[in-house]
Amino acid sequence: TNSSTSQIINTQVAAPVRSDGNCVGGFIGVYRSNNLTISNSQFNSYLKGNVSVGGLIGDATGEIKVEGNSQIAEVYNGGYNSIEGNESVGGAIGLAKCTLTAKDEFTINTQVVAYRTTAGGLIGRLDAKTLTLANFTFDQNMHVYGPDAVGGVVGQAMNGSVIDGKASVSLDNSIPKADSFTSHFPGTVSSGSPYGGSSSNGTAMGGIVGYAYSSSIIGVCFSGTVVGGERVGGIVGQIQWADAGYSFKNCINKGKSVTNSSGSMTGGVCGFLQYDHGYVGNLINYGKVDGSSATGGVFGQVKVGGGDKMVLTYMVNAGDVAGKDNVGGCVGFITGNGSTGNEINNSVNFSSVTNNGGGSIGGILGYGDIAKSCIFSSANHGNIK
């Protein structure tokens, strides 16, 4: 489709859509336009393709707006609903070089499977755009599968943002209760498939975003389960910032568990942060974190490059943390590559921190391989063992 303004109205697809090719969508394969409105429409069936596969659109640019009674539902008339492909697979859009907004509640309840890389419950790959999560609703039984770059909402965010404009975290007086935050994704993220079951060897696995490159993540909340093998986090598996101007703030994990039984870099909020520039703060973990090496209540591992001074501020861990090497209540392991003057401030751990193997352990930081840096105005109230 190539036009200035387009609409899909009162449309339902209940038959399977299968292709060995790329750009496969429940409604549209490729959309190139300024505006598209999808109103009172549903995709309720099985969808399979190769690269760029989405329940609504395979590959999209422009502005996509969803309104009315629209949904991607788990079952229609006894049918089986699953969105599957090899790469860039999303519950709604596979490859999104577009904005996607929901005027009314838009419900997604389907399995999403990438057999090679990049799967998201809403978008497989988000490219250079901002996704605002207002009015997107995901079922608690939803499961997103894939071996790499897998997120409950977005598999991979490249030079973009994933935000909720209304969410914020205030830590000025007391720690807010977990129930005061509304979850954006309550389901499960893991490797494996619906046919062979879940597995625990996936990389860059996150409750909201799998892998974020030069992207902001602001004001989001996760309440489900994440299982992976390396770079595993309650909000995001891996963040890599190469440019200035990005933020990771006001994010909450209140999920059941973040688990990594084999590899490294496991965090209640983020598995691995590669920092050169940006703002990091106001992050809370309430969930259980169970990892191997480099395990932390908020961050598993942080690597500081040669850019700005890094400040980690207002981090709170209120979930039990267990690991086998370099385990911390807030951060498991920091490495600096010659960076100096970095700091952790105004942070606190309230829960037990357990090291089941060798290496270091700390109430705030497990191990810091970083020169002339400091921790101040922070406290540990948990049992360290």
Question: Which ranges hold each PLM region?
Answer:
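Surface-exposed loop/turn motifs in large extracellular/passenger domains
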Residues: T1-K385
